């Protein structure tokens, strides 16, 4: 496993106090929603491990965070490989002396095809990343959260975690399952000081949705607010759920969808 580590102390501003003294592990943090979450956690005083399959991207983000005065490290992780996940989580705890916060965000969109034509290979690839990756992450994060005396986890689901969408059999199935996994883990660990919640973005303007202007217009039309969401808006809710401000919020599923699910 290749890693990149660099640390400096934060600036000590009021905003930096919320997560001071805590370590956060964020998957899929080299771009999009994960990148924005990592940035905001670092700005809030957390030591952040930027975990991503894109090793160079993770290193670039970690370097940017440390240059801004944060404590950060990068690690390559393949969330479809339980051993890779174990090593990445262990690296996090060893580098910063523990783990209190986790965001299981890594995911892929997969191919678009009707259920009857969806290939087994494409199905398995999406399930391995979007569902099994969350399970493997939780499985290795939870012992460290227990050792730390508690903590908070956010799993990234989707509006398709409670809705269907033509052509998205594997993606929707995985995101539905993430909600069930979130609720189960929350019930199991609530009495031991660990909160587990899920965030459900609508269609967000990230690199995953770039390149097809016609599709972009169609997706915008599905949201009553008349636009796609932003990574910043998803990160804002995620940080609230990780914070002590959400101390009695547990086992729940939180939409960030511009009214999509209310139609």
Question: What residue ranges belong to the model's regions?
Answer:
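Short, small/polar-rich loop/turn modules that mediate ligand/substrate recognition or access, typified
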Residues: 97, 150, 190, 195, ...
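Residue(s) in the substrate-gating loop at a strand-loop-helix junction
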Residues: 158
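Short C-terminal tail/terminal secondary-structure segment
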Residues: 2-15, 109-112, 163, 222, ...
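C-terminal substrate-recognition "lid" of short-chain dehydrogenase/reductases
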Residues: 96, 138, 227-256, 260-262
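Active-site helix of classical SDR
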Residues: 138, 174, 182
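Substrate-binding pocket helix/loop in short-chain dehydrogenase/reductase
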Residues: 113-115, 119-127, 219
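Alpha-helical segment proximal to the catalytic Tyr-Lys
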Residues: 143, 187-191, 247
């Amino acid at each position: 496993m290749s890693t990149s580590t660099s640390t400096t102390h934060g600036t000590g501003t009021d905003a930096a106090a919320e997560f001071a003294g805590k370590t956060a592990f964020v998957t899929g943090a080299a771009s999009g929603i994960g990148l924005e979450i990592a940035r905001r956690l670092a700005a809030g005083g957390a030591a952040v491990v930027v975990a991503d399959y894109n090793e160079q991207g993770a290193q670039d983000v970690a370097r940017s965070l440390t240059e801004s005065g944060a404590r950060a490290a990068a690690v390559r992780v393949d969330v479809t490989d339980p051993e890779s996940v174990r090593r990445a989580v262990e690296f996090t705890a060893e580098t910063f002396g523990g783990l209190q916060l986790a965001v299981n965000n890594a995911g892929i969109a997969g191919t678009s095809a009707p259920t009857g034509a969806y290939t087994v290979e494409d199905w398995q690839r999406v399930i391995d990343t979007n569902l099994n990756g969350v399970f493997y992450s939780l499985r290795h994060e939870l012992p460290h959260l227990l050792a730390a005396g508690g903590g908070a986890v956010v799993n990234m689901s989707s509006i398709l975690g409670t809705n269907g969408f033509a052509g998205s059999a594997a993606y929707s199935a995985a995101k539905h399952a993430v909600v069930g996994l979130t609720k189960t883990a929350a019930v199991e660990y609530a009495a031991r000081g660990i909160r587990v919640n899920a965030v459900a973005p609508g269609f967000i303007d990230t690199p995953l949705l770039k390149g097809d202007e016609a599709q972009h217009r169609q997706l915008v039309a599905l949201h009553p607010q008349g636009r796609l969401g932003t990574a910043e808006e998803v990160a804002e809710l995620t940080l609230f759920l990780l914070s002590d401000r959400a101390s009695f919020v547990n086992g729940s599923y939180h939409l960030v969808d511009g009214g999509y699910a209310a139609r």
